[in-house]
Amino acid sequence: MLALIQRVTRASVAVDAQVVGQIGPGLLALIGIEPGDTAPQLRRLAERLLGYRVFSDEAGKMNRSLADTGGGLLLVSQFTLAADTKAGMRPSFSTAAPPEEAERAFNQLVAICREKHSGGVETGRFGAHMVVDLVNDGPVTFLLRP
């Protein structure tokens, strides 16, 4: 399991030209689910998403987390993150979880984040073709694993 997180001033995701999730300042997290990802890993990733310090404090240092700022969290499932890109000129998706397993894990991650974060948790639509619009603040982008 991995999450590509971006600190944003705003982000939204649309399906069929209709916005299905949007946030103001906060984090956009693209989530890749791999076969065999476990409930403890989901909980750990949720902790990292909410607790990872990527927001500036009064001194300008990255010392504040999403939990500290109360910013929004936009979670978007993206199976291509889990692709094997080591060889050849075409990605292999054999390292991504099957759709049913991935959807179940993604929904569990969303539920955990919603339970723990009062700042608002929005999502895309699992399995849909989505258009993600964002303004990356910094830019600040990190790849997290549980």
UniProtKB/Swiss-Prot annotation:
GO molecular function: D-tyrosyl-tRNA(Tyr) deacylase activity; Gly-tRNA(Ala) deacylase activity; Ser(Gly)-tRNA(Ala) hydrolase activity; tRNA binding
InterPro entries: Daa-tRNA_deacyls_DTD, DTD-like_sf
Motif Gly-cisPro motif, important for rejection of L-amino acids in this chain: 138-139
SUPFAM superfamilies per UniProt: DTD-like
Keywords, sorted A to Z: Cytoplasm, Hydrolase, RNA-binding, tRNA-binding
A GO term from the CC aspect: cytoplasm
EC top class, as a word: hydrolase
Free-text comment on this protein's domains from its UniProt entry: A Gly-cisPro motif from one monomer fits into the active site of the other monomer to allow specific chiral rejection of L-amino acids.
Quaternary structure and partners: Homodimer.
NCBIfam families: D-aminoacyl-tRNA deacylase
Known function: An aminoacyl-tRNA editing enzyme that deacylates mischarged D-aminoacyl-tRNAs. Also deacylates mischarged glycyl-tRNA(Ala), protecting cells against glycine mischarging by AlaRS. Acts via tRNA-based rather than protein-based catalysis; rejects L-amino acids rather than detecting D-amino acids in the active site. By recycling D-aminoacyl-tRNA to D-amino acids and free tRNA molecules, this enzyme counteracts the toxicity associated with the formation of D-aminoacyl-tRNA entities in vivo and helps enforce protein L-homochirality.
Name this polypeptide is given: D-aminoacyl-tRNA deacylase
Lineage: Bacteria, Pseudomonadati, Pseudomonadota, Gammaproteobacteria, Lysobacterales
Encoding gene (name): dtd
